[in-house]
């Protein structure tokens, strides 16, 4: 049978139509809720989903896929699960959890997903960063060598912190853990105002996990009154927020801090506190039917904190020389630092500042136990002058504590022991400091130099704080400023004559 011209025409027409055929359909992989309760949804049908991927429920609530099983997917819900019903549709978003980052975040208060909660409108120009990323490798890092000043005499002299370090703040409730963190943020105000370049400025990220909303509001007020909010970001997952948001908040804050670290700038991040994050993670894991381990925590609770804290680093010069310093906070029960979570975090960090209730009630504030507190890498970052004056106090304080216990029993002590007790009592008095009153480093050096070199030895203990306040204001400003560069013999002679003269008034 011959092909007629009409048939050939029709064939060409059909071919052209088929080749130009285009479907503009968007194919979404969807699943259905099998069961829901306690903030956990079991979903059937999401066969291609990735671990840690965001999903969206029909009600608009979002969730994250944590358990990928044969039959279904275990999804933790970010928000209330009351609007989710059995049989509801669940849609994949195709994206791993990410948060906004950048300088537009400074001065803002956001939740664990980076959504502003301060009532000041949407965020302006920003980029998005994944919440979970790998920590920088060995080649990309450099050893810690720049100081991160807290403005607290007890910390900057005895347990110094460097940029890129992880220093744990550990203690019972109501011992002043948050106060140390806030003082550190406030101290950056005077340092940032003198900074001449981006590489000198230190930006701060404060992550509040499981705290009262009133506490977070109070913190915002303190920072804004001190004009410290302009270089700070607050990430809040309060006690009333669901456990998944309390688990996610530290990672979100870390991603925001990493923006500065990876762009050649410096950032400080405070996790307040990681005990509550571990409790939130335990709750999620048990509801997801993961096997419990010690203290009912899941087996990977160490990895929960290690992968977070390893992201704090000092980058090498080739990768921008930025840094992210971490100050995680852990709350202990009745001073037990050998519990599961405290020992985990102590082993991950580069040192710890131990706070004690007994010292706090004795009026030694910040209530730092100098014997238990260490900084494993910070001394390399300490200023030369501070290193020169702080060699002996730690040893003298240790000897004082040893002798003070025996001195309670006997009254007839030899002159050397009496002198040691006398000096120790004054060295215990010097690190005391009121809250929200950080001290510039040059004033700290002056005060510690006076105490270490015996200028306070004959002074009544109740006069020492007054003496401390007076000497930085009486000394020549140029001599005070020159202390940062180190102590030469000429400077020491000049300081000695000035301090001797001042001590006569007390």
Swiss-Prot record:
InterPro entries named in the record: ATP_synth_asu-like_sf, ATP_synth_asu_C, ATP_synth_asu_C_sf, ATP_synth_F1_a_nt-bd_dom, ATP_synth_F1_asu, ATPase_a/bsu_AS, ATPase_F1/V1/A1_a/bsu_N, ATPase_F1/V1/A1_a/bsu_N_sf
Single Gene Ontology BP annotation: ATP biosynthetic process
Binding site for ATP: 171-178
SUPFAM superfamilies (alphabetical): C-terminal domain of alpha and beta subunits of F1 ATP synthase, N-terminal domain of alpha and beta subunits of F1 ATP synthase, P-loop containing nucleoside triphosphate hydrolases
Keyword Ion transport: yes
Main location per the UniProt record: mitochondrion
Site keyed Required for activity: positions: 373
Gene Ontology MF annotations: ADP binding; ATP binding; proton-transporting ATP synthase activity, rotational mechanism
GO CC terms: mitochondrial inner membrane; mitochondrion; proton-transporting ATP synthase complex
One matching Pfam family: ATP-synt_ab_C
Location relative to the cell: Mitochondrion; Mitochondrion inner membrane
Keywords of this entry: ATP synthesis, ATP-binding, CF(1), Hydrogen ion transport, Ion transport, Membrane, Mitochondrion, Mitochondrion inner membrane, Nucleotide-binding, Transport
Top-rank taxon: Eukaryota
UniProt record similarity statement: Belongs to the ATPase alpha/beta chains family.
Subunit structure: F-type ATPases have 2 components, CF(1) - the catalytic core - and CF(0) - the membrane proton channel. CF(1) has five subunits: alpha(3), beta(3), gamma(1), delta(1), epsilon(1). CF(0) has three main subunits: a, b and c.
Protein name as it appears in the record: ATP synthase subunit alpha, mitochondrial
Name of the encoding gene: ATPA
């Amino acid at each position: 049978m011959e092909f007629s011209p009409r048939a050939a025409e029709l064939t060409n027409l059909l071919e052209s139509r088929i080749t130009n055929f285009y479907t503009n359909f968007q194919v979404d992989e969807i699943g259905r809720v099998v069961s829901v309760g306690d903030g956990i949804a079991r979903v059937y049908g999401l066969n291609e989903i990735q671990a840690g991927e965001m999903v969206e429920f029909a009600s608009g609530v979002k969730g994250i896929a944590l358990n990928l099983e044969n039959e279904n997917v275990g999804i933790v819900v970010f928000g209330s699960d009351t609007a989710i019903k059995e049989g509801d549709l669940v849609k994949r978003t195709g994206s791993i959890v990410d948060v906004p980052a950048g300088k537009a975040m400074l001065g803002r208060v956001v939740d664990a997903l980076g959504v502003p909660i301060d009532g000041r409108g949407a965020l302006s120009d920003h980029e998005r960063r994944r919440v979970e990323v790998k920590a920088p490798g060995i080649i990309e890092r450099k050893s810690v060598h720049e100081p991160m000043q807290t403005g607290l005499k007890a910390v900057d002299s005895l347990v110094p912190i460097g940029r890129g370090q992880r220093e744990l703040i550990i203690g019972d409730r109501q011992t002043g853990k948050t106060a140390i963190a806030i003082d550190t943020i406030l101290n950056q105000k005077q340092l940032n105002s003198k900074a001449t370049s981006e590489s000198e400025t230190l930006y701060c990220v404060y992550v509040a996990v499981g705290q009262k909303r009133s506490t977070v509001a109070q913190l915002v007020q303190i920072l804004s009154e001190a004009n410290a909010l302009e270089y700070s970001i607050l990430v809040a997952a309060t006690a009333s927020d669901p456990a998944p948001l309390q688990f996610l908040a530290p990672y979100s804050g870390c991603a925001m801090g990493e923006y500065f670290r990876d762009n050649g700038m410096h950032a400080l991040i405070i996790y307040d506190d990681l005990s509550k994050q571990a409790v939130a993670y335990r709750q999620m894991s048990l509801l997801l039917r993961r096997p419990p381990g010690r203290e009912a925590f899941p087996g990977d609770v160490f990895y929960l904190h290690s992968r977070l804290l390893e992201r704090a680093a000092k980058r090498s010069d080739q990768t921008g020389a930025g840094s992210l310093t971490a100050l995680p906070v852990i709350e202990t029960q009745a001073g037990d630092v050998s519990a599961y979570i405290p020992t985990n975090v102590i082993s991950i960090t580069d040192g710890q500042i131990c706070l004690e209730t007994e010292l706090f009630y004795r009026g030694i504030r910040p209530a730092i136990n100098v014997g238990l507190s260490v900084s494993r890498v910070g001394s390399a970052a300490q200023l030369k002058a501070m290193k020169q004056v702080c060699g002996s106090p730690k040893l003298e304080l240790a000897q004082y504590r040893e002798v003070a216990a025996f001195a309670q029993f006997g009254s007839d002590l030899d002159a050397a022991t009496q002198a040691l007790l006398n000096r120790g009592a004054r060295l215990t008095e010097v690190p005391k400091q009121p809250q929200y009153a950080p001290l510039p480093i040059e004033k700290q050096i002056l005060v510690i130099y006076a105490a270490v070199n015996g200028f306070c030895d004959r002074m009544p203990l109740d006069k020492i704080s007054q003496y401390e306040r007076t000497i930085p204001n009486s000394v020549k400003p140029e001599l005070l400023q020159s202390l940062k560069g180190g102590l030469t013999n000429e400077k020491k002679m000049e300081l000695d004559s000035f301090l001797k003269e001042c001590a006569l008034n007390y």
